[in-house]
């Protein structure tokens, strides 16, 4: 499973049950990274990908149902039992600080940065894409 998350400067993900932000340039970069493969996510996340609905696999239990090598866009806390199936983590960083109730953390130190690059966002001056693997 290839997990994709969006984080603020404090690794925040959600505030009051809602995503902190979104950016169309980020969505375009993610869809380019995924290629022809489906992008799995829940119904809440799918609303921001309406223009690419034919490329999505929408399932509110997607983390339990997605298999090996599958791309998963995650906007909620990752259940601990999912981590053994995670092969890579792509982090998009907003370079802003937002209020957050849910934060992201790797479960251990087995993850190393494989790639990092900045690109201009649509509503964010700069977004950093980081790819981690075990």
Positions of predicted regions on the chain:
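Enzymes that bind and transform nitrogen-containing heteroaromatic metabolites
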Residues: 1-134
């Amino acid at each position: 499973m290839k997990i994709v998350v969006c984080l603020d400067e404090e690794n925040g993900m959600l505030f009051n049950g809602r995503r902190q932000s979104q950016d169309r340039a980020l969505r375009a970069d993610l869809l380019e990274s995924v290629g022809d493969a489906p992008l799995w996510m829940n119904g809440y996340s799918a609303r921001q990908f309406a223009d690419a609905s034919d490329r999505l696999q929408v399932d509110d239990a997607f983390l339990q149902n997605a298999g090996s090598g599958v791309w998963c866009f995650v906007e909620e806390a990752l259940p601990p039992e999912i981590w053994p199936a995670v092969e890579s983590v792509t982090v998009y960083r907003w370079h802003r600080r937002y209020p957050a109730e849910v934060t992201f953390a790797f479960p251990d130190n087995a993850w190393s940065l494989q790639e990092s690059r900045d690109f201009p966002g649509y509503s964010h001056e700069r977004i950093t894409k980081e790819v981690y693997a075990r």
